[in-house]
């Protein structure tokens, strides 16, 4: 009796699954199962066949699908773990399945290897700084992770300083680790942020929107006042203008632009330019 029950469970799971290409741009919920197109012989009979993602290299040797945030491989299945809109990016070479991910409006930041973030130094323990990055636990930062730092020439980092760096270790089983140098040992803009300026927090979705290559908001903001600005993938923005009033205006604009249309932004920028 166990065998018919397992077959019935598999058929029930397959009936609930939906083809990923039919729900692109739509809202998906945690627990949903997605079916990805398996590329066999494009010229052959039948064309592409919708079936659950298989991790067997021999069974699916010509398809390489990358799962981004919000998706998880579970055996030979692809499951949704976050609520949001399903997105897809075609591969640059034109072969393979591309990248699938879920675009969600989550507020809590989860450290990801390679992300550039803004942190706050909360403590110093021996040769390690503890940095608050907005995650579930603080990140560790070695004093040797700065450009030109040696045992004799230590960086001037104090508790309360703002740090702009990137993650080199970020997984669920280990403490996040940050550095302020790139692979060549150069700072490349990372390190201790200036004492002046204003630090504020926005949603993670707004950060991704502002860092998009085709985003016009930063170009419009740059035309108003001379400014310095730093974006952290953990939802933090540091901005500095010539005066405190200009700094506050820029911060308010960036916070409000998430819920404004393009025409509304143009009206606000035109009023500020006239004033």
UniProtKB/Swiss-Prot annotation:
Disease: Pontocerebellar hypoplasia 1B: A severe autosomal recessive neurologic disorder characterized by a combination of cerebellar and spinal motor neuron degeneration beginning at birth. There is diffuse muscle weakness, progressive microcephaly, global developmental delay, and brainstem involvement.
Subcellular location: Cytoplasm; Nucleus, Nucleolus; Nucleus
Keyword flag Transit peptide: no
Organism of origin: Homo sapiens
UniProt record similarity statement: Belongs to the RRP40 family.
Stated name of the protein: Exosome complex component RRP40
PANTHER family documented for this protein: EXOSOME COMPLEX COMPONENT RRP40, PNAS-3 RELATED
Its job: Non-catalytic component of the RNA exosome complex which has 3'->5' exoribonuclease activity and participates in a multitude of cellular RNA processing and degradation events. In the nucleus, the RNA exosome complex is involved in proper maturation of stable RNA species such as rRNA, snRNA and snoRNA, in the elimination of RNA processing by-products and non-coding 'pervasive' transcripts, such as antisense RNA species and promoter-upstream transcripts (PROMPTs), and of mRNAs with processing defects, thereby limiting or excluding their export to the cytoplasm.
Entry GO terms, CC: cytoplasm; cytoplasmic exosome (RNase complex); cytosol; euchromatin; exosome (RNase complex); nuclear exosome (RNase complex); nucleolar exosome (RNase complex); nucleolus
